[in-house]
Curated annotation (Swiss-Prot):
Database matches in Gene3D superfamilies: Leucine Dehydrogenase, chain A, domain 1, NAD(P)-binding Rossmann-like Domain
UniProt xrefs under Pfam families: THF_DHG_CYH, THF_DHG_CYH_C
Underlying gene: folD
Species: Spiroplasma citri
Reaction(s) the record says it catalyses: (6R)-5,10-methylene-5,6,7,8-tetrahydrofolate + NADP(+) = (6R)-5,10-methenyltetrahydrofolate + NADPH; (6R)-5,10-methenyltetrahydrofolate + H2O = (6R)-10-formyltetrahydrofolate + H(+)
Protein's UniProt name: Bifunctional protein FolD
Subunit architecture: Homodimer.
Keywords: Amino-acid biosynthesis, Histidine biosynthesis, Hydrolase, Methionine biosynthesis, Multifunctional enzyme, NADP, One-carbon metabolism, Oxidoreductase, Purine biosynthesis
GO terms classed as biological process: L-histidine biosynthetic process; methionine biosynthetic process; purine nucleotide biosynthetic process; tetrahydrofolate interconversion
Superkingdom to which the source organism belongs: Bacteria
Residues binding NADP(+): 167-169, 192, 233
GO cellular-component term (any): cytosol
PROSITE patterns reported in the protein's UniProt record: THF_DHG_CYH_2
Length: 286
């Protein structure tokens, strides 16, 4: 395997986390309160529990205080909103994260929108997403932010490039499309209703897949020397962790590619930590 083709998100994320650790050590040296994140989990979804565990470990490694509040999935929407409002009003909490998905009886959008903008570490509230669309932003949703940071680290040109995104979620596809447009890329967003998907993916200079289907993108769907960013985290038929891209099948054709694991995932966590530190500095008016 030609390792020069690998876009190493784990390595880049460690560089980012080292800088954050350095800044938090300076905060500790001044005997000041360190950045604090509160994560809310409803129920015991296994995937959510794993994601939260990874976030908590990452926080502790860089010196961020991370508290997880777990409530049963019978909690009412009004009770959850009250909990969030209490956190909104707590000056010692810099960032709030509600782990999705939520139970069906709870309106996820209403709950997320309860988080005040200056504590919305995921960047999902309307004000943050609206500013992103206008090109005015200090904070970005974690996964799109991590992807852009990864592309910048590897000096991958965006201006004038045709970027095809598979997936139009509010969490990845839509905000990422806006970021790429702001970087002067030509962007095509494909989704479940796109006809003849391969016609679009075969035109991509950069292909980004966030569709959530194991090994969905095959070699026949891409052109030679494409750069591939795999956002998917899935399990294949043997229960092995894999992305949306059929990695081994496409590897000989690509110019560069992110692996799963070790690509976008670590960058999402690193971007989340950057967002927590940003909100802390805002809260402390540093």
């Amino acid at each position: 395997m030609d390792k020069t083709k690998i876009i190493d998100g784990k390595m880049v994320s460690e560089l980012i986390k080292a800088k954050i650790t350095e800044q938090i050590l300076k905060i500790k040296a001044k005997k000041q309160r360190v950045p604090a994140l509160t994560i809310i989990q409803i129920g015991n979804n296994k995937a959510s529990t794993t994601y939260i565990k990874n976030k908590k470990i990452a926080c502790e490694k860089v010196g961020v205080t991370c508290k997880v509040l777990n409530y049963p999935d019978i909690i009412t929407e009004s009770a959850l909103i009250k909990i969030i409002n209490d956190l909104n009003n707590n000056s010692k909490i810099d960032a709030i994260l509600v782990q999705l998905p939520l139970p069906s009886h709870i309106n996820s959008e209403k709950v997320i929108n309860t988080i005040i903008t200056k504590k919305d570490v995921d960047g999902f509230t309307p004000k943050i997403l609206g500013n992103l669309m206008l090109g005015h932003y200090n904070l970005l949703p974690s996964t799109p932010k991590g992807i852009i940071a990864l592309l910048k680290h590897y000096q991958i040109q965006l201006a004038g490039q045709h970027v095809v995104i598979i997936g139009r979620s509010n969490i990845v596809g839509k905000p990422l499309a806006n970021l790429l447009i702001n970087a002067s890329a030509t962007v095509t967003v494909c989704h479940s209703q796109t006809k003849n998907l391969s016609d679009f993916t075969n035109q991509a200079d950069i292909l980004i897949s966030a569709v959530g289907k194991a090994k969905f993108v095959t070699a026949e769907m891409i052109k030679e020397n494409v750069i591939v960013i795999d956002v998917g985290i899935n399990r294949d038929e043997d229960n092995n962790l894999c992305g949306d891209i059929d990695f081994h099948n496409v590897f000989s054709k690509v110019k560069m590619i992110t692996p799963v694991p070790g690509g976008v995932g670590p960058m999402t966590i690193a971007a989340l930590l950057e967002n927590i530190l940003y909100f802390y500095q805002l809260n402390q008016k540093i």
